[in-house]
Amino acid sequence: MSFKKLLPPIKNALQSLKIDTPTSFQKLLIPKIKSGVDVIAIAEEGAGKTTTLIINTIQKLNGVAYEDVPRALILVQNKEAALALEEEFNKFTKYTDLRIFCAYEESTIQFQKDTIYTGVDIVIGTPKRLNKIYFQNGINLTGLQMLLIEDADFLEGTSFHTEIHRIAESLNKCQFVVFSNNYTSKIEKLQDLFLEHAEVIEL
């Protein structure tokens, strides 16, 4: 597998970033996620998980803004992780018109609800804040195509899996993708709750 079958805006971004060849992990994972199946992806740091998440999200959304409701929801540990992922996304979306927004505890919930209402394609946020926004009717998930968890190791020692499950069980047809350095007890719990058919890819 190469990057040849990706959308032109993604290939242009990869070229500008001087990324020519996928990692062995990306060769396995990118086509698997593109196929639409639920995936739990386990690999060490440096395998290319974040880039894979970004590429597949843009690919799934066809690289274009569409209507007002979010089509991808990405769960992260905290504000710092959200902003870092947004920065990486910006490197890959510069040839698209996709709209990205971050939601976390250190900002007013009304501002976040208002911004989401005006129209975004990708929302990056913490489970706690997104759960609160959702149950205040501040985000419409009827058009959601992907629910992703970046670096799911952060779930250990928290109750976030409960908040994630609340969102997941409210969705209709949606692809779930989880990235992690390790296969943990909380990922196993997510499998029991709503990822029973997910393919586990471990490198």
Task: Name each model feature, range by range.
Residues 32, 63-68, 93-95, 114-118, ...:
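Conserved catalytic network of the ASCE P-loop NTPase/AAA+ motor domain
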Residues 1-42:
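Conserved pre-motif I regulatory segment
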Residues 39, 72, 100, 146, ...:
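Hydrophobic/aliphatic anchor position in the core parallel beta-sheet
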